[in-house]
Amino acid sequence: MKVLVATDAWHPQVNGVVRTLSHLATEAPAFGAQIEFLAPDRFFTVPMPSYPEIRLSLMAPGAVARRIGEAAPDAIHIATEGPIGHSVRRYCLSRGLPFTTSFHTRFPDYLAERLPLPERWTASMTWRLLRGFHAPSATVMAATPGLKAELQSRGFGPVGLWPRGVDAELFRPRPPTLALPRPIFIAVGRVAPEKNLEAFLALDLPGTKVVVGDGPARPALQRRFPGAVFLGARQGEALAELYASADVFVFPSHTDTYGLVLLEALASGVPVAAFPVSGPLDVLGGTGVGALDHDLRRACLKALEIDRVACRAFAERLTWRASAEAFLNHVTMARNTRRAA
């Protein structure tokens, strides 16, 4: 089975959507499936206003239909709600083709962080648009039970679970490489307003605060918090070494639907401190490998007491192969439903 995945998020972007899709393509052949991507690298792109790291695709009339025709997929999945996602959605609807979608990004929360408008206005409008986008989908895939329940309560459906995984061979306990005062509290990810890094950097904590990643908010945060160590973006082995050097991984975001970095930290044997919100609650709630508290400082200090061996053991159970299997099951069900009809 060949599955065409339409996505506006793609390399060289560094985020959870891109990592999830990359691992999906790697694991799918184990189930006799092939993943092909319709991504921005196939089109002319322009930088997104206020966020130039993200490129928006511009497509000539007929370009999407031509690309899909060349791919000749057995099934179509739409991963994002951007220009490519909208174009492929129109293509499928005009031809009566079934498709699945996935919900990766809390745009209502992101826009509330970025637009000088009352949150109730932006949230209501954005949820309405997202609900309309996903309405024709055979299955809307959500990463966690909590997100699934929220989408269902907001009128999305049907909603299915597509769990995430972690590369436990890359992200593993290692000898520390950071020669900084301990304990080391580390945050990894895009340095952008919606990640709420200010809540972490403003904490009165012992030791050292470290930020790994890049983004539009980095210059201002570096000026405001000169005592923190900003290391820029890292990938692969270099990133894995930094995780393993930390004593606590701090995740201050309120807007992430999952947070793959949580699993990467845990696989490295590093406990997590976070707010008790969707994402961290679904991943960490009741596991004993994370400290969740509305007082983030208290969560950070509690996390220092968590057993690192338990963190590693928890993450080892979450594999990308199982994630790919869940995805392909949803796609196959949608395809078979159309055949039966």
Kindly label every feature range from the protein language model.
Residues 262, 267, 271-274:
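Short hydrophobic beta-strand element within catalytic cores of glycosyltransferases
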Residues 305-340:
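A charged, aromatic-enriched C-terminal amphipathic alpha-helix characteristic of glycosyltransferases
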Residues 134, 241-246, 327:
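Short alpha-helical donor nucleotide-sugar binding micro-motif in glycosyltransferases
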Residues 254:
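Aromatic "clamp/platform" in nucleotide-sugar-dependent glycosyltransferases that forms part
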Residues 141, 177-210:
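Conserved donor-binding/catalytic core segment of Leloir-type glycosyltransferases
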Residues 127-173:
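Donor nucleotide-sugar binding/catalytic pocket of nucleotide-sugar-dependent glycosyltransferases
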